[in-house]
Amino acid sequence: MDPLRRDFLKTSAAVALTSQIFTGNVRGANDRLSAAFIGMGKMGRSNLGYAMRQENLLVSAVCDIFDRNLNTAVQMTQKQPGGPAKGIRDFREILADKSIDVVCIATPDHWHPYMTVEACKAGKDVYVEKPVCVVVDEGVKMVQAARKYKRVVQAGTMQRSAVHFAKAAEIVRSGELGKVTFVRCWNYGLSEPEGIGNPPDQEPPPGLDWDMWLGPAPQRPFNSNRFGVDPADRYFSRFRWFWDYAGGMMTDWGVHWLDIVQWAFDEGMPTGISAFGEKFYVKDNRETPDTLQVTYEYPGFLAVYENREGNAQSMFDKSGGILFNGSKGTMYLDRGGYKIVPEKGSALEASEMKSTSGGNREHWANFLDCVKTREKPTSDIEKCQHSTTTCLLGNVALRSKLRLDFDAQKWTVNQPEAKKYLSREYRNPWKLVV
């Protein structure tokens, strides 16, 4: 049998297993896992929906510091066997509840590290959304906590659970595209010139605990864009565009694409990073750039991530994706599938594969199965820590205006002026301690 075919069958079989609804008996014939969900915005409710389709899972609690989100999440659980989930405003109640087995953390990014570490210390297994952290040091501690407390921690980079992404990564690893020396990832769009607007600071809305929302982040007056929740629920929260809480498109979408790139190249990390970008187009109060280009030097190839909000024209008429450029051919890959275009004179045949699933449901099934088996999940925290760090380094290069040399053994850069961006000080009383 062709080696690529054999390896793909192994990979596909592993991914396909996760597409089955989780039916493992974790603690007894009729005993279900008890789950709690922290952060019930659009992403949290999406995870809640996929998790509730799994068997042997009872959603015991949902948690949010904004009444509207909390009430909506409780309502979603009304018809589940076992009755509706309890609505909780303080996540520490969930961590103290010994009856809860697993937690899903889908808060704004700046809360991910603290909640994940504390959940591991409390004996919970964790499904945490991507990007898993806001600075490099936090990701290192998250991995340390998972290993120290022997917890299963799955990150929300669900593309790894989609069959066509697994097949595409195997194609790159197999050499079918020849020597791949250049990879391009992008997200292009055309925003309105006013962007997200310039709302003034004001009092927080009723039903929101703004101080708790900020948590370990610096004290700031309430601003509707920093909070970012759309009253009409039309878009994901705009906190993503402020450095205190996130890393802009570089970490929000870049982590999806670069996670697949690093998967295809056996989880390797970049050694050199340079970046250029600015707010050239939109006139709003966001802090992250609307135009960005980051170049990563890996052993043997270069990868580029690009984002722009002032022009939507792109390769293959796609707003985002990955191009793997090899000596025998090029592969375009996104959530819709992949397409291979041979180089002139190459024996490589043109081919394509359509997506059959986005991977969300399979990702949850894989997580719950690993809770049972105690094996590492498809997107183990260490893999997403690597991918998130790669994205964060792009922002560090941008903000420091330096070309970075990265040491993956020590998780640091060789440029002293840039090291201040690798960690952050937590606001009292929060401390990130493994």
Per-region residue spans from a language model:
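Alpha-helix C-terminal capping/helix-to-coil transition sites in glycosyltransferase folds
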Residues: 97-99
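Conserved SAM-binding strand-loop segment of SAM-dependent methyltransferases
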Residues: 85-90
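Residues forming the Rossmann-fold NAD(P)(H) cofactor-binding site
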Residues: 45, 113, 255
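N-terminal Rossmann-like dinucleotide-binding module
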Residues: 12-80, 159-162, 261
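N-terminal secretory signal peptides and thylakoid transit peptides that target proteins
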Residues: 1-16
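Contiguous beta-strand/loop segments that form the cofactor/metal-binding neighborhood of enzyme cores
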Residues: 166-167, 179-382, 388-434
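N-terminal Rossmann-like NAD(P) cofactor-binding module of classical short-chain dehydrogenase/reductase
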Residues: 103-104
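Beta-strand-loop-alpha-helix segment that lines the small-molecule cofactor/substrate pocket
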Residues: 108-109, 113-161, 175
